[in-house]
Every structure is written in C-alpha cells, then in structure tokens.
UniProtKB/Swiss-Prot annotation:
Positions of ATP binding: 53, 66, 419
Name of the featured protein: Pup--protein ligase
Spans through the membrane: none
Species, as recorded: Mycobacterium ulcerans (strain Agy99)
EC id: 6.3.1.19
A GO term, aspect molecular function: ligase activity, forming carbon-nitrogen bonds
Active site: 57 (proton acceptor)
Function: Catalyzes the covalent attachment of the prokaryotic ubiquitin-like protein modifier Pup to the proteasomal substrate proteins, thereby targeting them for proteasomal degradation. This tagging system is termed pupylation. The ligation reaction involves the side-chain carboxylate of the C-terminal glutamate of Pup and the side-chain amino group of a substrate lysine.
C-alpha cells in the first residue's frame, strides 16, 4: 500500500500556576479548557470542521486525533494544527480565569510523562489490508519499533537513585507488553484492538502506542514515514533478517538508555544485536525498496534523514542532524546550558528546561523559540498550519466529514458524526455511512448537505 491512510492521536499534559490564593485541580483546569468546546458541541468529545476529533481523555488529558491523512507532510501539518487548536483553548481559558478573578497561567505540554511519573501517549494509526497475516506484521515491526527511538525519540532526563541520565525516549520506561489489546493498564508497543474505522472486511487499523510525542516536524515525519515504509515493505514481501527480541520490554529500556546505539540487546535464541545493527537492516532494505517503488519526494526525504541519523549515531557527530531530530536538539540544548552555567544534568533547572521544551504556547515554549531561531528544521509553514486548523485534508474521507460539519453548523442543524457516520438529527434521522477512508467525494454526502 503506497498510499496509506494515517493519523496521530496526541494526549497533552496540563498544569496551571496560580497568581492568587485560589487553586484548581487538574480536572477543574481541564474543564476550563473545554468550556468553549462544550458550549457549542454540548460535549467534551467533538469532531471539528477540519475533520479532527478533540476530547478530554482519562486523567484530564486533552486529546487531539488528527483527521485521516494520506501523505506525510499533510499528517505533520495536521498534527501541528492540533497544537494550535489546543493553544487557542488555553488562551481562552486563561482569559476566563482572569475574568473570574482566578489569575493563572495554563501550560499544555506535548510530552509523555509528568513529574509524578504518569505517562500519556502519542498513538500512531496506519491503515493496513485485512488480507495480510497480522502476526508477520507484528513480528517484523516489533524490533523496528523497539529501536526506532534511536532515530525519533523526544529525549528525556531520567532521574535515577544513582544519577541523572539522558535517555532517548520518554515513553520507553512506561511500556509493559509487546502486542496486546490494552492501552492504559499494560501499555503494549502495538495495540491489537480491532477498530478499523473503515470497511472491516477490507482493512484493519494498526495502532502503535510506543512512540514519543515529537515537537520537531522533521522528527514526526521520520517517525511515521519510516513505520509506514516498513509496513509497505512487509506487505510487498520484502525479506528481513530475524531480529525477534528475547524480551522486548527489557530491550526498549536498554535502547533508551544508550545514545551510542551500540549496546547489545538479547535476541530470541541467545543471539545479540545492537539498536544500530537492527535499524541499519531496516534502513538498507528501505534504500533497496526505493529503487523499485514509485518515486515519492517525501518518502525519499525520510530515507535520507534516516540514513544521516544512523551515521550520526555511529560516529557520535550530530552536526549534520542537530536541527532535525528531537532528542539531538534537546541534548545539545542541555549541554550548552550545562557548559554555560556549570551545572550537572541532575540540576532542577535542566528538568525545568526539559519540560519547557514541550510547552506548546508560541512565544513561551522553548522548542518554539528554537524553531524561530532556525535551530529546528520544518517541513510545513505557519500558513499551511493555519489552513489545517480550519480545513480538512482534501484527499481523504476527512473532507466529507469536515464539509458536513461546516454545513450543519452554518445551517444551525443538529447533527452527530463519528469516524464513519454522518447523521442529521431530524425526524428522518438521515445517516450516511462512509466506509472508504480514501474517498474524498461522495454524492450521498452532497445530497445530505444540499437538503439542509
């Protein structure tokens, strides 16, 4: 499948610092954030005009699920649009707090752990054909996903009883299973719950919950681009060396704790391989695969960055990727800070900087400041993100959903939507079922809109 439907769900961390005496719990802060959403959507679980879903998840975490996208840059743009949508709610909620005499600054973090050790996720969704053998997909994909943090981790300072250490991934410490149907209790790498949001006879949705939330656009593109390409190669029957891991849960932590990528991890049957070895195998197969697949500039850009990042890890010279990979950008920032102020990695100011990197408020968040200085590479523009805040992708089913929502809101009609249904809540209860996520034009939807 060279044209694949993809989406990203991001849970955001939320906190608030108060100027006055009154304090609010995280639940109350989240309710302030969603008050405007509830006022027009009558719920804290809504679909937006751009086709995305916005809701309050378990544990007061705002969650944004992008609309269905069918290209990498489109997905990165809509992922960034989610940050802007949440930032808009943040500004509105701060104004409400001020109006009610509760002065406070609200912070939304696009990260994966809070100071109490709780974890929240970034979930990737990839459409795959039902006909394939799912066990082969998971067998080949698992070693790739365990070691993928080497190229696209968000980076984190982990405080251990011995010392502070820099890790590649925020999520690695919180993963407890390889393949499972749970998402919160045991946190697997691949979630098997079968909800295709499409024609179930044709498709299933691969739900990957091991990845970090990325701030840098090129890192997000690398994360989803490499995974989608590995899936494409599996579907095409490309042979891979067997890197079945003896213990994926131990391996994911070992990889995260080693920025050199050279630490050997145990494979099934007693063999060993390093994260670098494993990633090199998938990368070299991808380079070969590019010779036979349809040319695609975005996919070629991904493979180029993949190779340059592996070279950088191998040589430990990151100069050629230090504006493109989150954990490399962050580590360089910490090192400069430590040198300038003569401080240890365990200094609380570094932990503060670690958190501030993920602050999504423009003009305040550290990553945003780096990006403005040209220290983080982009694949999209502010104009494209602003457009994605208001408009759905034009090449997928999301267009139908977005146009239906916009028309119903403009006509003042009561409606219900989810990923596959568009329904007018009138006497006739007219409903259109959109089972094909690739279909951006549908006469039935046009007629439903015309009837409003």
């Amino acid at each position: 499948m060279q044209r694949r439907i993809m989406g990203i769900e991001t849970e955001f961390g939320v906190t608030c610092t108060f100027h006055g005496h009154r304090r609010l719990s995280p639940d109350e802060v989240a309710r302030y954030l969603f008050r405007r959403v509830v006022s027009w959507g009558r719920s804290s679980n809504v679909f937006l005009r751009n086709g995305a879903r916005l809701y309050l998840d378990v544990g007061s975490h705002p969650e944004y699920a992008t609309a269905e996208c069918d290209s990498l840059v489109q997905l990165v743009t809509h992922d960034r649009a989610g940050e802007w949508v949440l930032e808009d709610l943040l500004v509105d909620a701060e104004q409400r707090l001020a109006d009610e005499g509760i002065g406070g600054d609200i912070y939304l973090f696009k990260n994966n752990t809070d100071s109490a050790g709780n974890s929240y996720g970034c979930h990737e969704n990839y459409l795959i054909v039902r006909a394939g053998e799912f066990s082969r997909i998971s067998d080949v994909l698992l070693p790739f996903l365990v070691t993928r943090q080497l190229i696209c981790g968000a980076g984190k300072v982990l405080q251990t009883p011995k010392a502070a250490t820099f890790c590649l991934s925020q999520r690695a410490e919180h993963i407890w299973e390889g393949v499972s149907s749970a998402t919160t209790r045991s946190r697997p790498i691949i979630n098997t719950r079968d909800e295709p949001h499409a024609d179930a006879e044709k498709y299933r949705r691969l739900h990957v919950i091991v990845g970090d939330s990325n701030m840098c656009e090129t890192t997000t593109m690398l994360k989803v681009g490499t995974a989608s390409l590995v899936l494409e190669m599996i579907e095409a029957g490309v042979p891979f060396r067997d890197f079945s891991l003896d213990n994926p849960i131990r391996a994911i932590r070992e990889v995260s704790h080693d920025v050199t990528g050279r630490r050997p991890v145990r494979l099934a049957g007693g063999r060993q391989a390093s994260a670098l070895d494993i990633q090199r195998e998938y990368y070299s197969r991808a380079v070969e695969h590019l010779q036979t697949r349809e040319p695609n500039a975005q996919v070629e850009q991904v493979v180029d960055l993949w190779g340059r990042q592996l070279d950088a890890v191998e040589s430990q010279d990151f100069a050629k990727v230090d504006t493109e990979i989150d954990w490399v950008i962050k580590r360089k920032l910490f090192q400069r800070y430590q040198d300038r102020y003569n401080m240890e990695l365990s200094d609380p100011k570094i932990a503060q900087l670690d958190l501030a990197y993920h602050d999504i408020k423009r003009g305040r968040g550290v990553f945003d400041l780096l990006q403005r200085k040209g220290l983080a590479t982009r694949v999209t523009t502010d104009e494209e993100i602003a457009d994605a805040v208001d408009n759905p992708p034009q090449t997928t089913r999301a267009r139908l959903r977005g146009e239906f929502i916009s028309a119903a809101q403009a006509a003042g009609r009561d409606f219900t939507v989810d990923w596959v249904h568009l329904k007018l809540n009138d006497q006739a209860q007219r409903t259109v079922l959109c089972k094909d996520p690739f279909r951006a034009v549908d006469e039935r939807v046009k007629r439903l809109i015309a009837s409003m």
